Amino acid sequence: VGAGIIIEGQLLHGSPVGAGEIGHITVDPGGDRCACGNYGCLETIASSRSIIRRVRNLAKGNPHSAISDLVSDPDKLDMETIFLALEAGNEDVRQVIKETGEALGIAAANLVGVLGSCQIIIHGSVARFGQLLLDPMRDTMERRALAALTRASMVGITPVESDIVIQGAAALVLHNELGVL
C-alpha cells in the first residue's frame, strides 16, 4: 500500500528509501505481524493480499460458507472470488471490507493530520469495493482527524481501469516543466 504524495505541485521523494510508504503506518497496535517486522501495519489489513488471507481464513474456518460454494479450495481464493461473494451478499466478506475501510480511514486521518487538507484517491483492485470501502473509511477519518481538516479533504476512488499513476506522472511533468495545469 503506497501513496504518491504531491505537495505544491512537487512529488515528495523523501529519503533514499522513498516516501509514501503508508502501508507501514500502524493502524492496529495489537494486529498481525507485517513482513517489515512491525505489527498492525496498514499493509496487514488493506492490501489485496491481506484481504485474500483474511477471507481465506474465514472460508477455512467455515467449510459450509458461501465462499466455499464459490471456490472448493480456499487456497485458490482470489480477489475476483471475493467480489463474487460480496455480490452474493456474504456478510463475512462485507465485514472484512468494512474493517479494511476503517483501517484506511485511520491511515487517512494520520495523513490529513500531518499534511493538512488533501485529496485521497483509492486505486487498484480494492477500488472495486466502492462505497462499501469508502463509507467506513470516511467515517473513521472524520472521527479521528480534526473536523476542519476532514471537511476540507476529499476521499474518492478511481475507476479500476484507470491509468491514474501514469496520468499523475504526466500531470506533474506538464506542471513542472511547462507550467501547464
Where on the chain are the PLM-derived regions?
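A short, polar/charged loop-to-alpha-helix boundary motif
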Residues: 18-30
